[in-house]
Amino acid sequence: MDLIPSFSLETWVLLALSLVLLYQYATYSHGFFKKLGIPGPKPLPLFGNVLSYRKGMWSFDIECRKKYGNMWGLYDGPQPVLAITEPDMIKAVLVKECYSVFTNRRSLVPVGFMKKSVSLSEDEEWKRIRTQLSPNFTSGKLKEMFPIIKQYGDVLVKNLRQEAEKGKPVQLKEIFGAYGMDIIIATAFGVNVDSLNNPHDPFVSKANKLFRFDFLSPFLLSTVMFPFLTQLYEMLSISIFPRDSLKFFTKFVKKTKENHLESNKKQRVNFLQMMLNSQNFKDTESHKALSDVEILAQSIIFIFAGYETSSSTLSCIMYSLATHPDVQKKLHQEIDKTLPNKAFPTYDVMMEMEYLDMVVNETLRLYPVANRIERMSKKDFEINGMSFPKGTLVMIPSFALHRDSKYWPEPDEFRPERFSKKNKENIDPYIYMPFGNGPRNCIGRRMALMNLKLALIRLLQNFSFYPCKETQIPLRLSSEALLQPEKPLILKVVSRDETIRGA
C-alpha cells in the first residue's frame, strides 16, 4: 500500500511553501532577545514558552529568576515578553513612564464590551474611568459599606459553625467562596444573597459562570498563538465571558437604572448606585460621566476581580494560621484584647490592628493572587541602556519576587514579623506588590483588605483552626493563572465557646 499521497508537483510545491510560511510565522519573533543578548528559555515554534506554564506561571518564573538573573526574555506565542526584577526598572515602568509608555495591559483575549472596564480599558478612556471610580473606593465610602460587610461576616460564622458542629474536618473553599460572592454581589449591586444556602439564586449561578475558563484551553491558546484571532473573535461577538451571564447582568443594570430614575427614596449604598449617581448633567454633557455600558462593565469586573481574591486568600490565611499555632494564638490575643466579648469592630479600629495587618500582609507575600504584573509598551523605550520597540510586553514576576531570598530571609517561611512597624520600613514597595503599584494599581485594594480583615476577626473571635490528616502539608499551589491551592483546603475547626454574637 502506498503511504505517500499521489499529489501533483504543483501541490507538493504549494504544500512545502505553506509549511515554510507556517514555520516562519511560528518563529519569526523568536530571535528578538537573542539579538539583544538577553538570556531566556528556548521557545517552541508557534507556542513560544506557554507550555511551560503547565506547572504554574509562578513556578516557571521562579526557575527563570534563578537561572537567568535580573532580566530575561520569553515568548507567549509570537509575543516577546521582557521580564524585569530590579526595583528601579519596575518603578520606571509602573510609575515614571506609566502615562507615556506603559499605560495599558495587554489585550490578549476577546472580551466584548468588558473592554470598557477599568481593568481592561486603555489610555485616555482608562484615565477617565479610573477618575470617575476612585471616589467610590475612599475610606469614607467604605465606611458607609461597612455595615453590609459586617452582616456577611456573621453569615460566614453561622455557615462555618453549622459545618463544624458535624464533628468532621471542614472544606473551607465553599464557605469562603460564598462569603466572597455574597459581599461582592451586595456591594456591587445592592442585592442580598446567601449563596452557600441558595446556590440556584440567579445572581449566584450567573456570577459563578464568569470564572469557568481555563487559560490553557484551546480557545485561549489560539489567541496566544495567533493574536490576530482576537480581533476576529471580537467581530464575531465571541467572548471569554459567557453570553447568558452578561445578558442577565445587562438586564439587571438597566432595570436598576429605571428604578433609580423613578424613585426618590434613598437606596442602600452600593457601587452600582454610586456610579448611577455620578451620571450628572454636567459630566454627561462634557462626556466625562460613565456611560451605561461602562457602568455595566465595572459592575461585572468587580465580581470577576473580587470573588477569587477573597476566597483563595482567606483559605491561605487559615492554612498558615492552622500550621503556625503560635501565630494564631497571638492573633487571637490581639483580637480578644482589642474587641472584648466578641465586640464588633469599627472600620478604624480594625484598620489599626497591627498584628492582624502583619498576618494579612505576610499571607499576601506568600500567596499573591496575581502571579505577574504586565504592561504593554505603546512606544519605543529603553531599559538598562537597551532599546526596545513598541509592542514589547514588560512583565514583573511578582510571585517570584515575593519568594526571592535576596529580599526575604527564608522566603518560603510564614513570618508575620517581616511586616512589623520596625521591619516594614525596609520593605521595598517595588518588590512587595500584592496589589500592583503606580497609577494603575488595584483600585479595590482597600475594599479587599477590609473584607479579609473583617472575616478574620469574626472567624477568630469564634473558632480555632487546626490541621488534620486531610490537610495538604506543605500547601501545593495550582497551575491556574489566579493563584489558589491545588486542592480544596480542609481543616479541623473548633468553636472557642458556645456564644456567637449576632450569628
Swiss-Prot record:
GO terms for biological process: oxidative demethylation; steroid metabolic process. Its EC number is 1.14.14.1. Its main location: endoplasmic reticulum. Pfam families: p450. Heme binds at C442. Induction: P450 can be induced to high levels in liver and other tissues by various foreign compounds, including drugs, pesticides, and carcinogens. Keywords: Endoplasmic reticulum, Heme, Iron, Membrane, Metal-binding, Microsome, Monooxygenase, Oxidoreductase. It comes from the Eukaryota. Signal peptide: none annotated. It is an enzyme of class 1 (oxidoreductase). GO terms for molecular function: heme binding; iron ion binding; oxidoreductase activity, acting on paired donors, with incorporation or reduction of molecular oxygen, reduced flavin or flavoprotein as one donor, and incorporation of one atom of oxygen; testosterone 6-beta-hydroxylase activity. InterPro entries: Cyt_P450, Cyt_P450_CS, Cyt_P450_E_CYP3A, Cyt_P450_E_grp-II, Cyt_P450_sf, Cytochrome_P450_3A. It catalyses: an organic molecule + reduced [NADPH--hemoprotein reductase] + O2 = an alcohol + oxidized [NADPH--hemoprotein reductase] + H2O + H(+). It is a peripheral membrane protein. Its cofactor is heme. It is found in: Endoplasmic reticulum membrane; Microsome membrane. GO terms for cellular component: endoplasmic reticulum membrane. The keyword Endoplasmic reticulum applies. Transmembrane segments: none annotated. Belongs to the cytochrome P450 family. Cytochromes P450 are a group of heme-thiolate monooxygenases. In liver microsomes, this enzyme is involved in an NADPH-dependent electron transport pathway. It oxidizes a variety of structurally unrelated compounds, including steroids, fatty acids, and xenobiotics. PANTHER family: CYTOCHROME P450 3A5 (PTHR24302:SF38), CYTOCHROME P450 FAMILY 3 (PTHR24302). This is Cytochrome P450 3A15. The gene is CYP3A15.
